[in-house]
Amino acid sequence: MNPFEFFIPQNITVGAGTLAKLPECAKKLGGSHAMLISGPTLRKMGVVDKAADYLKDAGMAVDIFTDVEANPSVTTVEKATEAYKDSGADFIVALGGGSPMDVAKAVGVTAKYGGSITEYEGAHKVPGKIVPLIAIPTTAGTGSEVTAFSVITDHSRDYKLTVFSYELLPAYAILDPELLTSAPASVAAACGIDAFIHAEEAYVSTAASPFSDAMAEKAMELIGGNIRRFVARRTDLEAAEAMLTGSLFAGIAFSFARLGNVHAMSHPVSAFFNVAHGVANAVLLPVIAEYNALADHGRYLKIYNYISPIPVYEDEFEPLMLVDAIRELNEDIGIPEDLTIAIRQAKKGEEISDEEIESKIDAMADDAMKSGNIAVNPRSSRKQDIVKLYYKAL
């Protein structure tokens, strides 16, 4: 058993209608003026205004920043930091999926301590507490509301940098399943499978512990048992709450056990080709699961039974059966069949040749090898292994 310790200094509220508790959380932080960071789609849907109105009705001032893109950039963090400073706000509300939360965490750092977010890349470089932050997820995917990470794209390097510090943990997390019901099926699928992969990679990680295992197993049970149902019918509040809670547990699991080759390899795919994070992960998962099968010590059976409609017993199971089950799940929820298709879909009509995609593989492998997640993957990997895995995923 690996030695382990855990630290979760957060207030977490889960349940339908809990968005209404936002002013109460803000008051406990001593806040009077919010900077609400979100995305343009949620603004158009009225979700941003709904959250803002709760704060305004409680007598608080609200400024809104919604210029957050998928795979948010260093430039976006700089713009949001400037907006925060100009507003006079004293706390931040992150409303959305992983992108607004990544930006909000980064702004919490740079607004307080100055400089570029690139200066805080790596582990434990944030000098102290950041601007008080309340996180409200509108997707069941990233688990960012309970993680100590911010992932930002540096276009000058075609690289997704990671800031890791327990100071990034939001003070409050509000998980309201009613906020998930308007998500398109494609978003629900990509985010949901991302959450499942957080749990799966934490579960097979060489850094796994009894604590992270407990979180990961419950996450896989909740997500595996509800993802097909939720993607098919996003207004199903019971399924939405299960997905949201599963994503929460998965976020806690990987905060302690870390991830693996799937995430190490998916970040370069998003940086080079702007493929949605969850889609990149989902396409890579069966390839990595097959690669890691040689290192399985009985955990693949449990993972299989969490996602397969028909459970099996130990004497019926072979590790490669999990690979087939993952591909079946991806197909059921509309995930692209391979990385080439995912990249071309992300280009939205812009032509890209096989040769152009392949020309980036060496650089992507270099970036993947820089990830700390490689170190805890259950099967060791060299650069040439990562290159082969990218080609296999195409």
Where are these regions (language model features)?
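C-terminal charged capping/lid subdomain of soluble metabolic enzymes
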Residues: 308-394
